[in-house]
UniProtKB/Swiss-Prot annotation:
It is found in: Cytoplasm. Its main location: cytoplasm. GO terms for molecular function: 3-deoxy-manno-octulosonate cytidylyltransferase activity. It comes from Acidovorax sp. (strain JS42). GO terms for cellular component: cytosol. Activates KDO (a required 8-carbon sugar) for incorporation into bacterial lipopolysaccharide in Gram-negative bacteria. NCBIfam families: kdsB (TIGR00466), PRK05450.1-5 (NF003952), PRK13368.1 (NF009905). It catalyses: 3-deoxy-alpha-D-manno-oct-2-ulosonate + CTP = CMP-3-deoxy-beta-D-manno-octulosonate + diphosphate. Pfam families: CTP_transf_3. Keywords: Cytoplasm, Lipopolysaccharide biosynthesis, Nucleotidyltransferase, Transferase. This is 3-deoxy-manno-octulosonate cytidylyltransferase.
């Protein structure tokens, strides 16, 4: 992607976390985790990187380290709602591109951010962009915490699911049909793992929270299914590099601290 193609990175950060309280402020090598995320994101081609926080303590921690941050309402139901408010606060135009980088991804690859932003610069018919990576184990294919995505020939998402999709009709019901090295698989097929990074047009992001929730979204607990349900297209970048580990638990935090020297 040309680094001249403009976009803004927004990083939602919420202080409350069931499994890891005060997660955005967790210390990693002497810096709050959300600052690590912002610094990684700033290595992309983004014009600016902004943290959208629900608590003044996050804003203060970011500003102390030179990271732009906004205080948003604390009662937002989702990160998308928080980002929609941030778009308003920043005065972004409807066609401006926004990339949503999660605040618990201190190992995010800046090149992935660029690639997901580039999807919307290249695809005027898409309202959203995201990323995926080939699944390389039967365990991940079966794991409901590993979200799968199926694409069409144009690289647009057909569907996202926690189930192992697609399913091979002739395989025994109730058993896993795919594993690495599986024979009889159509040429070019590989199951894909969804990576939780998104690009949006700011106008769509403002409207998204007002769209009625989709039945599929409610069943799968996957917010992106709302966009598909209402007829919006999601372009998908398939990366050859496995994504960096996110931080959801104390064990994840210790692993990242080891990797980043803290």
């Amino acid at each position: 992607m040309s680094r001249a193609a403009p976009f803004t990175v927004l990083i939602p950060a919420r202080l409350a976390s069931t499994r890891l309280p005060n997660k955005p402020l967790a210390d990693i090598a002497g810096l709050p985790m959300v600052v690590h995320v912002a610094r990684r994101a700033s290595q992309s081609g983004a014009q600016r990187c902004v943290v959208a926080a629900d608590d003044a303590r996050i804003v203060q921690a970011c500003q102390a380290h030179g990271v732009q941050a906004l205080l948003t309402r604390a009662d937002h139901a989702s990160g998308s709602d928080r980002l929609a408010e941030a778009c308003e606060l920043l005065g972004l135009a409807g066609e401006d591109i926004v990339v949503n980088v999660q605040g618990d991804e201190p190992l995010i690859d800046p090149r992935l951010i660029d690639a997901v932003a580039a999807l919307l610069h290249a695809r005027g018919d898409a309202s959203m962009g995201t990323a995926a990576h080939a699944i390389d184990s039967a365990e991940d294919f079966a794991n409901p915490n590993v979200v799968k995505v199926v694409l069409d020939a144009q690289g647009l998402a057909h569907y996202f699911s926690r189930a192992p999709i697609p399913h091979a009709r002739d395989h025994a019901p109730g058993s896993l049909w795919w594993q690495p090295g599986q024979t009889g698989v159509p040429v070019g097929f590989a199951p894909l793992r969804h990576i939780g990074i998104y690009s949006y047009r700011a106008g769509f992001l403002r409207r998204f929270p007002q769209l009625p929730a989709a039945p599929t979204e409610q069943l799968e607990a996957l917010e992106q299914l709302r966009a598909l349900w209402h007829g919006h297209r999601i372009a998908v970048h398939v990366t050859g590099s496995a994504p960096g580990a996110g931080v959801d638990t104390p064990a994840d935090l210790e692993r990242v601290r080891t990797l980043l020297g803290g």
